Amino acid sequence: DTPWHIRDEGIYSLEKGKTHYTSNAGLKELKVEIDHYLDRHYGVSYDPDHEIMVTIGGSEAIDAAMRAMLDPGDEVLIPQPSYVSYVPCAVLAGGVPVIIELKAENEFRLTPEALEAAITPKTKLLVMPFPNNPTGAIMEKKDLEKIADIVREHDLYVISDEIYSELTYLERHVTIASLQGMRDRTIVINGFSKSHAMTGWRLGYACGPRIIIEQMLKIHQF
């Protein structure tokens, strides 16, 4: 269950009449705190006014990002096993899902060799589902650096689904957005469902370059 100190704040907000429309991108106060959290924990910072948007859970953020970034026929690289919504989101956005099978002998991590083999001239986007659902696999910094080199070389974009970032125990989570040259080609997806036991509250967020977040906001609005 959601911890009581969070529920109490929700009750307080209802009692105070905080039930009206907000900015399309979410409460400014929340976006400022999201930026502080990402900067403090992962060394990456975003402009709360233009580079962060609050979404209806992480799933809406994934959907909006794909709709904003994909043209018809663009290929989306999706490592699997992974969250079941990536493929339908890509299809609904007009993209073509390309599955990269993650293997047990590699601890279900995405390898540079597997990534290179999947890239074609039509590849636009790579989904990075780490920490992974359902395998629990993580990508260490040294792993991410090799992936980032390939992403930059092929001028790809990344959707980094980091909803399980607080549920790592042996290695501290590293976001690929914090690596050299990756912030402006990565959309970081996260939220409060897993870290704060708030699955039913549907509270997520996306962070990334202003030009992409602005397009995602149009989709979020309409």
Listing of model-derived features with the role each one plays in the protein:
Residues 74, 95, 151-157, 182-184:
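A short helix->loop->beta-strand "cap" motif at the edges of active sites that frequently abuts
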Residues 91-98:
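A short helix-loop-beta submotif of the ANL/AMP-binding
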Residues 179-222:
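Conserved core segment of the aminotransferase class I/II
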